[in-house]
Amino acid sequence: MNARTKPQRKPILSARGIVNRFGTQEVHNKISLDVLQGEILGIAGGSGSGKSVLLKTLAGLHRPNAGAVALNGKKIETIGHAERASLIGVLFQQGALFSSLSVAQNVMLPMREHTDLAPEARERIAAMKLELAGMSADTGVKFPSELSGGMVKRAAFARALALDPRILFLDEPTSDLDPLTASGIDALIRRLNESLGITVVIVTHDLTTLFTICRRIAILADKKITVGTLDKLMQSHQPWIREFLHGPRAEGALTARKQSHGNG
């Protein structure tokens, strides 16, 4: 191998021939996708394109009508629940924290369900995960209702990281957040990816997130998927993709991308 040639990333997750339909409505028609080890992959598409359904399919939370998903070369449905929980972390759109549990108790929940760690060890790890997500350890005693929207997202990140997953699935991580808070979440995602090597799959309609932190983007349109770098997708002639990436809202995201890459 030439010393200047970068080693090719291998897929950590592969989906082949995915078909999802609800009743007579087909959402995905034989979609195939590789998620590469260590990348941040963004998934975008219009309303009704099945972004969240695809995310759940890739994470093993939804069984497709046809096709298969493999994680580390193993069919995802053959991986035991505990092993899958240790490999995959999921952040749902609204955080999905239990309101009756404190923040720390929410973070410890996966440890209680899937490990035999002592309570003291769970508490110590929960404090570490909260810090990793950009929260102080004393936030752990609070309840979700006492947190801002951005802090709820960070607490959900901490819980998703509880079992040291190799791949994170994030459903609209910056939705309902002001631009400054959303920027902080983007920075957190990039830091987790760069410092821990975690592979990240993000469903988002946030163009700034897509343009600034995603190595590749997968766009759902007409029941199919188109995958590539932003530069490659910008050259697409598919009508929805072209309108999405060249519309008025894309201009600000492109400016943010130039600034981000200039600072990076």
Question: Locations of the language-model features?
Answer:
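Helix-to-loop junction immediately C-terminal to a conserved catalytic motif
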Residues: 59
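Conserved ABC ATPase signature
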Residues: 143-147, 151
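Catalytic Walker B motif of ABC-type/P-loop ATPase nucleotide-binding domains
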Residues: 168-171
